[in-house]
Amino acid sequence: MRGLRTACALAVLMDAGIASDLQAQERLYVVNQAGATISIIDQDRLVVDTVLDLRTLGFSPNAKPHHVVVEDDGSFWYVSLIGDGRVLKFDRGNRLVGQVRMETPGLLTLDPEHDSLYVGRSMTAVNPPKALGVIARTPFTLVDEHEIVIPRPHALAVSLDGQWVHTASLSENRIASVETATGRVRLTTIAGAPRSLVQFALSPDGRTMVAGGELSNTLLVFDLTKPPPFTPAREITVEGKPWEPRFSPDGRTLYLTLLTKNAVAEVDVATWTVRRTLDGKLAQPYGMIVRRDGRYAFITNQNTGAVMEGHSGHEMHGMAGMSASDGWLTVLDLTTGAVKTTLMLGNGPTGAGAARAR
């Protein structure tokens, strides 16, 4: 009987551990750039579970957390701090376990095949280094700052096979693609008017990469089955300063935040046409995550007022004269197109991250 009780107790502990791991996987992390805080949200209960104040960890009120990415199993998550010039590593218990110094770190992306964390540069930096940061995730040390030639590198993505990391310039129509095995850089130049590619998204099968051009009001589609340099396979008009794209889990639909239209475009990937425009309780929608089951989209709203005519969203973002205010998270039901709920966030929310988000 004692052996049976022990076995049962161990089974309960194992189940509790598995439940804890699953719970960590279902967290959504949102950085509040102007408030130096991070909101941690339960994706199933749709509530703010924890607010982590970076000032209590010794960082400054001007830390400016900008972006966050999460390991697929939820074991660790990473945050870039523009103001304090750091990239941080937290464990699933929200304990700070590592930090790396870097000048004006911006977007982050995880290499799915190697131990690398790639770091772009902040959109608000006047003259950031023309280099891509490479951090070894396990020891959490800076391995390299890889020279990539293009100015103001921002949009960032890694191919699913880990062979290429792509970053795009905000100020030029160019993409730098780094071959991870050799470090060689291949440059793509896109002809025509300025696009200002904000962020990349990869389809679940890794065959397609997209980016919103906020100045051109277009969505650019790239074929990743061919090596760089690229020529856009398609470019479609999407008005409203397209910002962050995200694919649905089945890859059939693309969602795209529209910064000045206060809306989200839903794009049919088979035809590359806008199927519908979703709105309601959106105010300068910025970052976005689609939940693992495709039911909800989580959208961060900056709530900073309209972007001034003739200016890019990057010029307005966090710059002098812009008063950031408390934003919120809009939870959109992607079946009905209706707002499920909203959750208050902190000051100036920007990036969002969750396990298995690409």
Which residues does each PLM region occupy?
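Positively charged n-region of N-terminal signal peptides that target proteins for export
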Residues: 1-5
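Predominantly soluble domains enriched in secretory-pathway, periplasmic, or organellar proteins
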Residues: 20-358
